[in-house]
Structures are given as structure tokens and as C-alpha cells.
A protein has these predicted regions:
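Conserved ABC transporter NBD signature motif
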Residues: 57-67, 74
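Helix-to-loop junction immediately C-terminal to a conserved catalytic motif
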Residues: 49
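Conserved structural motif at the start of ABC-family nucleotide-binding domains
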Residues: 2, 16-20
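Conserved catalytic motifs of ABC-family nucleotide-binding domains
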Residues: 156
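The feature captures the beta-strand-to-loop junction immediately N-terminal to the Walker
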Residues: 34-36
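Conserved ABC ATPase "signature" region
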Residues: 98, 113-131
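Conserved ABC ATPase signature
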Residues: 110, 135-139, 143
Length: 161
């Protein structure tokens, strides 16, 4: 469960971009954050992901304060799908999906066959099996976004943002 209570954020000494934002999302629920450009939707999600620190309020994940959670546990339980295409250096699609397991693949341990089997199965489920070995640089924006969603889901997170 994700719970945001009276969240507020602003850059530096500037006025708060948003304040008093509260919501709760339970397991199995979906939440859409809507609003005009520049109102702070992405910034709020970046705060939830701990890329930015709130100026006020609290974020809890499964009842624990997010800012006090162990970093390894936090990243094990949560996956994030960015909204913009990132530089990917021509990785094959399947490798991009396997990178979602990076917390499980430590230095000295390369991805295993079962990691790739999971990635191929997920790509098939998303209708992307035919492009699994294609370079990410050749994908449309929509295809690439689906690859990023598959990468986020491969580790079975409790929360997908």
C-alpha cells in the first residue's frame, strides 16, 4: 500500500509546487494523477520514488515511512516506469527487460538463462516477442514504453509507478 499524507514540494527557496497532497492506493488498485502541465505530477512521483525529498508531509509504503526505509528493500518492492525515452545505447530489447532484475544480479553474477526466459515470456505477453532481439534504438515511442513497463514488472514489484 502507498499512502501520501499532506505532501508538499518546492525547488530551493521558490514557492511550493504542490502542497497538502494526500491519497492512498491499496494492493490491486490503480490511481491516475491528472492535471495541467507544470502542476507537479511528475515531481510528486519523483518524490514517491525518493529521487526528490518532500519539503512537508509523509510518504508510507506498507505502513513504513519511505524516507526511513532501507534502500535495498525500497528498490526491491517498487518499480518505476519513466515517461520519457532514455538513452539506451542500442541494447537488445530482451537485455533492456533483464536489466529490471539488476538488484538481483550482483557484481560477478551475470544474468542466468531463467532471467532471459522470464524476459522472453513477459515480452510475449506484451505482444513484443517478435522484437525481443531487436535494438531498442529502432523502436517506436510506444513500443519502447511497453519495453520499459516489462522491465519494471520482471522483478514482480509490490508497487508500480
Amino acid at each position: 500500500m502507498l499512502k501520501v499524507t499532506n505532501a508538499g514540494f518546492g525547488y530551493g527557496n521558490r514557492p511550493l509546487l504542490f502542497s497538502k497532497v494526500s491519497f492512498e492506493v491499496k494492493a490491486g488498485e490503480t490511481l491516475a494523477i491528472l492535471g495541467p502541465n507544470g502542476i507537479g505530477k511528475t515531481t510528486l512521483l519523483r518524490c514517491v520514488m525518493r529521487f526528490l525529498a518532500l519539503k512537508e508531509g509523509e510518504i508510507e509504503i506498507d505502513g513504513a515511512g519511505a524516507k526511513h526505509m532501507n534502500q535495498k528493500r525500497f528498490w526491491r518492492d517498487i518499480s518505476y516506469v519513466p515517461q520519457a525515452k532514455q538513452l539506451v545505447f542500442g541494447y537488445p530489447v530482451v537485455d533492456m527487460v533483464v536489466m529490471g532484475l539488476s538488484q538481483n544480479i550482483s557484481i560477478g553474477r551475470t544474468p542466468r538463462r531463467e532471467d532471459y526466459d522470464r524476459a522472453y515470456a513477459l515480452l510475449e505477453k506484451f505482444g513484443l516477442g517478435s522484437i525481443a532481439n531487436q535494438s531498442c534504438n529502432t523502436l517506436s515511442g510506444g513500443q519502447f514504453q511497453m519495453v520499459l513497463i516489462a522491465r519494471a514488472l520482471i522483478k514482480g514489484p509490490g508497487l508500480l509507478i
